[in-house]
Amino acid sequence: MKTLLLDAHSICYRAKYSPLVGLRVGNQFTGIMYGFFRELHVLLKLFTPDRIVFTWDSKGSLRKKLFPTYKENRYTRIQTAEEIAFDEACSKQFVMLRDEVIPRIGFNNNYKFEGYEADDLIASIVQNNLGDFVIASSDMDLYQLLSDRISMYLLSTKKRYTERHFIDEYEILPKQWVRVKSLAGCSSDNVGGIPHVGNKTACKFLTNRLNTESKAYHAIISNRGKSIARRNYDLVCLPFKGTPVIKLGTDALSISELKLVFLDYNFRSLLKPDVFNEIQRLLRGGSYYGEKQSGCGKSVKT
């Protein structure tokens, strides 16, 4: 069985900065939801999965208990009133998709757990379920999960990324990536690394190719360097400690409900006969398909 694992939060976030984000029906903004379903159509065509799983970040993070400044650099200046209003309008669409629209259609593998991030849930899923997985995300932390049955589709480059691609690029095994990030840190999450050490330098250290006279080498083997690496390991290793074990269930997809969603939000391009028929055909090809009664979807699993 081939499962498409969506970092749904990441897909929505990318749609937030698309030219179509301002779409609306009445007073309801719909651009993020439209962008989400358009991306889903693309992914269905690319991978023809048997099953689709949606994973979401929670608002808070348990990692902050280990590292209080975790992800605190997301805003480097005070937001304007317009920017705050825009963020709030976008957040409403995230929640509507997660809690109402996706369950309404009958996708039952839809997960959010308080304190955990989408990549934690993705890691739990691939570790506790059989089959092949394609992870749709741009989160480089997920590289540590790559294997002969787990690949990625990088949303940022729109390219497939496999275990072989990773080994060719970094000259280490995917399971060593967590050690790389422990040494180098992650600037996007405000997790500082060891001074003078980036991803490539960390890879050289792990494969004994780093000059033992270099500043980076001595920084890594110093007491401070070892302390930073120990702290970072728990932050970057997936899944984070305590992440629930997730066993995937069965969907009960309703094509009629999907069509009603597209009608309700005026997603006209997705309702064109050739487009909608293709979406319907691709979804019906999955083992999750089973026509359910309207309105019987389950809410997000938390």
PLM region spans:
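Conserved RecA-like ASCE P-loop NTPase motor core of nucleic-acid helicases/translocases
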Residues: 135-139
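Non-catalytic nucleic-acid-binding/docking modules located in mid-to-C-terminal regions
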Residues: 42, 46-56, 71-77, 82-85, ...
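Hydrophobic/aromatic side chains embedded in well-ordered alpha-helices
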Residues: 1, 133, 189-192
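Noncatalytic, basic helical substrate-engagement surface that gates or grips nucleic-acid strands
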Residues: 2-132, 142-160, 237-253
